[in-house]
């Protein structure tokens, strides 16, 4: 591969058959086999855009901070919400209907890491991952679902919904109990192995303090296949992305403490930034580089 944007196909195994996607990979100038690898996971619709719609600032980051960028593109028409944001863990968007683990979309990240390592003869043993909006939904569910994933640092920025890592299904103090996709209750992700691994991750919960547009209004009609965003368990998280993120942060820490699980997550509140992927990425750079 050349020192610029490269692209190659990748075959995803899904419950609906194999689907070919494009993967974009940026190589900075110079020797790349010892450089860290960063996965960029696009937001909703980003899979229909060149390099997930972040080509300019991702390549600038790669050159300035000497990283290889890997950006898989999952087209929205072939990877609707239950495939992309929810990871194909369940065959339903409003309850848990088991899907074989071999079809979970998250497997593709690990497969792509191995492919890129092979292409570059890379010495990297781990990788970093950043996702904004729907990409942030992807990232935090990916970490919960894949306890053996070789991730060193992960950023979940401004997700519109969260799956709470609480086996009891309780999001708040009301006593109401919610299942998938609002929580991991009664799913494989609720066992101690998955939860301990997830809480132990170096994950940044990154929230734009100005990302306060009402999601109940935005997704009132379930536009774009996002009906799950206004399920009761999602609405219980809050009315806007910032509120939902803060509810997630608080409840997850309470639950981890109650179970005696160590939690290595960090919270970054970004002032005066709304639903803006470029600005959120810029605000997370220091944390991504802090190893």
What are these regions (language model features)?
Residues 1-37, 50, 64-68, 94, ...:
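A domain-start/cap signature at the N-terminus of enzymes
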Residues 3-6, 206, 218-233, 243-291:
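C-terminal catalytic histidine-bearing segment of alpha/beta-hydrolase fold enzymes
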Residues 25-29, 58-60, 186-204, 285-288:
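Short amphipathic alpha-helices and their capping/turn segments at secondary-structure boundaries
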Residues 31-35, 40-80, 163-164, 213-215:
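Short substrate-entry loop that stabilizes the transition state in hydrolases
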Residues 39-41, 157, 270:
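Alpha/beta-hydrolase
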Residues 42, 131-133:
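Conserved alpha/beta-hydrolase "nucleophile elbow" surrounding the catalytic nucleophile
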Residues 89-120, 127:
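Alpha/beta-hydrolase active-site loop
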Residues 152-254:
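The feature captures the conserved acid-bearing segment of alpha/beta-hydrolase catalytic domains
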């Amino acid at each position: 591969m050349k020192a610029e944007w490269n692209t190659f196909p990748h075959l995803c195994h899904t419950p609906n058959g194999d689907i070919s996607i494009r993967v974009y990979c940026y190589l900075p100038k110079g020797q790349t086999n010892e450089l860290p690898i960063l996965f960029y996971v696009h937001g909703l619709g980003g899979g229909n855009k060149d390099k997930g719609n972040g080509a300019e600032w991702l390549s600038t980051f790669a050159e300035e901070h000497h990283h290889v960028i890997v950006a898989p593109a999952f087209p929205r028409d072939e990877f609707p919400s239950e495939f992309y944001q929810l990871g194909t863990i369940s065959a339903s968007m409003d309850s848990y209907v088991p899907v074989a683990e071999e079809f979970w979309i998250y497997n593709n990240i690990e497969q792509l890491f191995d492919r890129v390592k092979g292409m570059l003869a890379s010495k990297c043993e781990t990788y970093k991952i950043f996702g904004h909006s729907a990409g942030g939904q992807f990232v935090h569910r990916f970490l919960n679902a894949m306890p053996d994933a070789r991730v060193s640092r992960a950023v979940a920025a401004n997700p519109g919904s969260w799956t709470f890592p609480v086996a009891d299904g309780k999001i708040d103090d009301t006593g109401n109990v919610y299942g998938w996709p609002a929580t991991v209750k009664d799913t494989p992700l609720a066992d101690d192995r998955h939860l301990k691994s997830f809480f132990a991750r170096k994950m940044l919960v990154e929230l734009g303090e100005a990302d306060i547009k009402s999601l109940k209004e935005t997704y009132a009609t379930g536009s774009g296949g996002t009906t799950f965003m206004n399920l009761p368990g999602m609405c219980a998280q809050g009315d806007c992305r910032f509120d939902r993120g803060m509810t997630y942060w608080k409840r997850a820490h309470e639950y981890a403490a109650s179970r005696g699980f160590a939690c290595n997550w960090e919270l970054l509140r970004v002032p005066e930034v709304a639903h803006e992927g470029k600005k959120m990425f810029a605000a997370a750079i220091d944390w991504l580089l802090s190893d």
